[in-house]
């Protein structure tokens, strides 16, 4: 979680230098971070950060309205693929944690990105949904020519990693 928070710019209580496009991220202004997070960096947070008082689809619309990245048909296909079609209009707070995790995952795909950060992405998913998530994120990253960074101390998402680092 700390690694993703550092790279995503939510925390800066670290020593050393993190560069993005040859620029030290500690030098970025708020405006630059907004643009980076809108166009280059996507994140699935471990704590999900969904709005429990909104429905599943409203949580996705919030993000997608900002980016305009996915069509309604594409969003509905993601809900279908992850077994959430019948949960579109259910308040997120009424969903199980695994269902909330899938909603948060869909939200992370609703934007362009150069890198997607997945912080404990399948911790509350069964094997079938974990596999579907693996296929979806791999397909989206390939389509966008993007990198995937995963942090995990528990259940591991099965991707064809270029490199695995143990910290």
Language-model segment annotations:
Residues 91-95, 99:
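Conserved ABC ATPase signature
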Residues 116-120:
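Catalytic Walker B motif of ABC-type/P-loop ATPase nucleotide-binding domains
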Residues 16-26:
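Conserved ABC transporter NBD signature motif
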Residues 72-87:
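Conserved ABC ATPase "signature" region
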Residues 25-42:
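ABC ATPase NBD coupling module
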Residues 8:
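Helix-to-loop junction immediately C-terminal to a conserved catalytic motif
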Residues 105:
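Hydrophobic anchor residue at the start of the ABC signature
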């Amino acid at each position: 979680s700390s690694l993703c928070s550092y790279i995503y710019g939510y925390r800066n209580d670290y020593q050393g230098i993190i560069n993005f496009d040859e620029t030290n991220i500690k030098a970025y202004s708020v405006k630059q971070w907004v643009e980076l997070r809108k166009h280059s960096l996507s994140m699935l947070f471990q704590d999900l950060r969904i709005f429990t008082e909104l429905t599943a689809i409203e949580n996705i619309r919030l993000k997608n309205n900002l980016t305009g990245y996915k069509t309604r048909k594409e969003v509905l296909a993601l809900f279908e693929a992850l077994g959430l079609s019948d949960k579109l209009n259910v308040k997120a707070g009424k969903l199980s944690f695994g269902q909330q995790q899938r909603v948060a995952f869909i939200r992370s795909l609703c934007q362009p990105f150069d890198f997607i950060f997945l912080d404990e992405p399948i911790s509350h998913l069964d094997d079938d949904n974990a596999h579907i998530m693996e296929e979806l994120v791999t397909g989206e990253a390939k389509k966008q020519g993007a990198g995937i960074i995963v942090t995990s101390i528990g259940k591991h998402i099965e991707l064809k990693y270029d490199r695995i680092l143990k910290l």
